[in-house]
Amino acid sequence: MERLSEDDPAAQALEYRHDASSVQHPAYEEGQTCLNCLLYTDASAQDWGPCSVFPGKLVSANGWCTAWVAR
C-alpha cells in the first residue's frame, strides 16, 4: 500500500502532516497522533498504517489530521 503524501488533495483538505510535532492548527493538542486515533485501523502498525479516512493509503503513526478522534 502506498504512503499518503502531504500534497494529496484529501490530505491537504484535512491538514494532514506526517509529523504531529510540526502541526500548527488550533484543533491540535499535544500528544495527538495517528497511532492513538480511533480512525487508525491497525494500532499494532508502529510506523505507517491504514486510516479509514484515507482508504488505500498508509499514514504515519506519528502523523495528525483534523479528523483525529481519541481511541
From Swiss-Prot:
Q: What is this protein called?
A: High-potential iron-sulfur protein isozyme 2
The cross-references to Pfam families, in alphabetical order and at most eight, read: HIPIP
Q: Which domain of life is it from?
A: Bacteria
Q: Which annotated residues bind [4Fe-4S] cluster? A: C34, C37, C51, C65
- Source organism (scientific name): Ectothiorhodospira shaposhnikovii (Ectothiorhodospira vacuolata)
GO annotations under biological process? Answer: aerobic electron transport chain
Instruction: Name the UniProt key words of this record, in alphabetical order.
Output: 4Fe-4S, Electron transport, Iron, Iron-sulfur, Metal-binding, Transport
TM region positions: none
Q: Which GO terms describe its molecular function?
A: 4 iron, 4 sulfur cluster binding; electron transfer activity; metal ion binding
Q: Say which family it is in.
A: Belongs to the high-potential iron-sulfur protein (HiPIP) family.
Subunit structure, briefly? Homodimer.
Report the protein's function. Answer: Specific class of high-redox-potential 4Fe-4S ferredoxins. Functions in anaerobic electron transport in most purple and in some other photosynthetic bacteria and in at least one genus (Paracoccus) of halophilic, denitrifying bacteria.
* Record's keyword annotation contains Isomerase: no
Q: Does the keyword Iron apply?
A: yes
InterPro entries, alphabetized: High_potential_FeS_prot, HIPIP_sf
